[in-house]
A protein has these predicted regions:
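Active-site scaffold of zinc-dependent metalloenzymes
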Residues: 8-51, 63-67
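Catalytic Zn2+-binding segment of zinc metalloproteases
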Residues: 60-77
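N-terminal soluble segments of membrane proteins
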Residues: 1-15, 101-104
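Alpha-helical hydrophobic/aromatic positions enriched in membrane-embedded helices and signal peptides
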Residues: 50-54, 73
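A short, structured loop/turn motif at beta-sheet edges
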Residues: 56-58
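Post-HExxH zinc-binding segment in Zn-dependent metallohydrolases
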Residues: 75-104
Length: 104
């Protein structure tokens, strides 16, 4: 997962990045890192001010849904704990970018 504060498509680095939607605060794309030949998820925030608790929660759920889809897992009442832990981990990663305080 990559987190960026930019509306750039980073086309020199990633494949699969959508053009910026001017009505959005943030966009999530499933991408391929061309430098390392790795798949992953890129979340872009329009600005540092767009990284709000509400947007972190919203984008984290999109990211977790994409990861569940990729691994063939279903989001349902039977495995909501696993999904919720993943959403929390994603939200924490985004919050580290927001605060500039990164965990080792």
């Amino acid at each position: 997962m990559w987190v960026a504060v930019s509306t750039d498509t980073f086309s020199d680095r990633f494949e699969g990045v959508s053009e910026w939607d001017d009505t959005a605060d943030a966009i999530v794309d499933c991408v391929r890192d061309k430098l390392r030949n790795l798949g992953g998820i890129l979340v872009r925030f329009e600005s540092k001010n767009a990284i709000t608790i509400a947007n972190i929660a919203h984008e984290s759920s999109h990211i977790a849904m994409n990861i569940f889809d990729y691994i063939g897992a279903k989001v349902d009442l039977a495995n909501q704990e696993t999904f919720s832990y993943l959403v929390g981990w994603v939200a924490d990663c985004i919050n580290q970018v927001r605060t500039g305080k990164f965990k080792d």
